[in-house]
């Protein structure tokens, strides 16, 4: 239990924290002056943390009220003040003390009771806690921690209070310090201002002191001067006085006594004199100073005036300086703005100068191009004039020959007899009959001679052909003309053609162009051969147009070409674009496509030509089939050759035709009519340089290239005909020369190719031993074909690629990996192909590559597509009629090529046998090679092209041998090439076989069906030979087509011309 003292201590404390009564009680007790209450309140000061229970607070309330009551009494007593009696005050104070003590005692009693009750409760709680041992320990620890925490809180509160106080004190100190700082700063500034003022005052005082020193020094000097002057005067006076005094001394001494009173008078006199002197000296000095002062004042006035004027000048100068400064700033700003404008103008002028220079360069290039074009057009015009003259001569000669030979021969001679009657009438109209008879008798031998004679006549006609390349091209062109002329004669009338075919071969290209009107005169003939090819084609609106258009292609070509360079352009363009898109090709695509397709030659154009740049490029396709067929149709069977003939004469004779049909088609069809004028013209002024170059854009490029325009184009235009052909396989070799190369790149390339164009036109015709004979004649003739081997070599990029690739497309299809290898191997074979081409130009060219250059190129897009499969058969079939029509002319070629043609036909037959077997494979394989070849072909095509070019030189060296050997050795060198490249031998043989199977079976089966169906319609005469030959050869040419289609697709892919394939697909779909 708690002691009473502790209870007393505890009783007073709870009032302060719990109820605030402690403080009130303390205040009242202080006012009352009761020390007991003061001590009680003091005892409560330590009791802050106690008072846990409400009992103590409740018990404290009565004492609080009592204390309040007693305090009010004490206040009343205090309010009375000292005015009351001391006794009353004492009595009251004692009463109050007693009351307070009683109240306290009562409060203590209450507190004790409450505390005792509280202690009892606490003891009960303690007992309960003791029973709960674990809980008791935790409670103690908890309470201890709570007490410690409370103490810490109190301490921290107190510390925080102290810190706050300290912070406040510090803030106050800081405020005082800042105030002192401000005051000190103000005082310092004041002191500094005072120091500056004092410094200024000191400077002024110093200046005044210096002036005063100067004045004092001057006054001292004057004083010293005056002193000396005065002393001197005094000395002088003394001297005077002494001098007088010496004489007067005695007198004075004597009379001193008497004269004592005179001394004073003397002194007075002296004084008067001295005063007079002093006055005088003073006046003089004053006057001197006055004068000096006047002078100084005048000088000061002058100086002040000068200073005033100087100050005015200074102020004026300052104003001027400010004005000049402002002007300078303005001028600087204007200068900067002008400099910025100048820099901007310079930049603009530089940009303008650059643009003007670019425009000047563009205009110079355009001017140069236009000059080249003008030169080419002039050359074409000259060539056309020469052609016109030759055609006029040929027309008369042919009319005579036709009249005489029709009377002499009569009707129905066999194509061989026709070729014997027609064979080689030289381009010279005077010697036509004699040389034709000689050519009839000695076919193969005389062909070379006729080639020479035709070359001579062509040289006579085209005097600009100076170079050997031009001569070779002229020979090739004359051969093409002779062949085409013979073919035209054959197509015009089998007997008349056979009788006059040599002449027409030599002249008909020009004559068909010039005669094409005449042949156009006989649209029946113009139609009949072509229409003999297909009544549907004859019926086709293209051919329905063809009578006029037969006239127009031939007339548009020949008359237009003969007529003017503009028409030379137009014939060329009419040939190239016009033929590519004109009746020839209008007929041709339609004719090529089918009688049904013939319904819309324009549609045939648009699907075949318009739809696909490849078909647009394969106007060679459209032309080679269509132009090959429809020129024959449009122009006549002769004109069916005349596309080649018109093309070849144009190609052979006119750079415009060679350029425009070939170039207009290749560049224009491929590029533009302007370029159509001359890919080589644009490519090389060399093509502009000579008609032969004009004839062979390639001729401008190289003799070998001059030997073959395609050589020029194929190496030059496309790195290889394969490349040039694949991009424009239909166009550049085929269509670029497709007017001629429509027959074949071979025609544009050389007479042999001009023959093979005819043969290319009728590779199926040329497929007939007749045209292989014609090719052998072309090859027998071919120094030009030896040229054409080069051409074929240069073709061979397409041809070598097409012989090997064209042959190996099937194997490339079957062995496309091998072909990738063998193409690389073929690059050697490109050499051997050059040989094989030199020897095979007839082989590969004659039916296969002659077709395949143009047709494979022309058809390569088509063969890549189903159109190639369908339309190519139609083309071959359409061509086969043309070839049959031409087969009438080829009889001489048949006689010549009977020997070579038979091995080819045998090979073709064996290919036919193999064709059905491989027919299905090639289809899949062609698609594979298309994908696979693109990989192999780009580099391999280049390698083969380079090697073919290399091989082209040797082949050019041995042109005649190769020409003769080409047919005899085609198989041998094919076997040699196969021996060289075992993969290639199979590729070559298979190419022949597989090419025959691939495209042939695609085309052959279709072509055999369609050609057989069309051949009976076209010419039953042609059908017997043409069908067999077409069947034998179409397989090979169609192979080359498939091969070249595959190769062209590879090279097209190489040349990034899958876009052409897409148009070809569209064209194929349109054709379908």
Curated annotation (Swiss-Prot):
Q: Does the keyword Lyase apply?
A: no
Please give the chief subcellular localization of this protein. cytoplasm
Q: Where in the cell is it found?
A: Cytoplasm, Cytoskeleton; Cell projection, Axon
Q: Which residues form the IF rod domain?
A: 94-409
Which residue ranges are recorded for the region named Disordered?
454-1072
Q: Which residues carry this modification: Phosphothreonine?
A: 832
Q: Give start-end positions of Basic and acidic residues composition bias.
A: 501-584, 600-620, 720-774, 781-953, 963-1072
Which residues form each disulfide bond in the chain?
none
**Spans of the sequence repeats?**
507-512, 515-520, 521-526, 527-532, 533-538, 539-544, 545-550, 551-556, 557-562, 563-568, 569-574, 575-580, 581-586, 587-592, 593-598, 599-604, 605-610, 611-616, 617-622, 623-628, 629-634, 635-640, 641-646, 647-652, 653-658, 659-664, 665-670, 671-676, 677-682, 683-688, 689-694, 695-700, 701-706, 707-712, 713-718, 719-724, 725-730, 731-736, 737-742, 743-748, 749-754, 755-760, 761-766, 767-772, 775-780, 781-786, 787-792, 795-800, 801-806, 807-812, 815-820, 826-831, 851-856, 859-864, 879-884
Its function?
Neurofilaments usually contain three intermediate filament proteins: NEFL, NEFM, and NEFH which are involved in the maintenance of neuronal caliber. NEFH has an important function in mature axons that is not subserved by the two smaller NEF proteins. May additionally cooperate with the neuronal intermediate filament proteins PRPH and INA to form neuronal filamentous networks.
Family to which this protein belongs: Belongs to the intermediate filament family.
| Protein name (record) | Neurofilament heavy polypeptide
Q: Species name for this entry?
A: Rattus norvegicus (Rat)
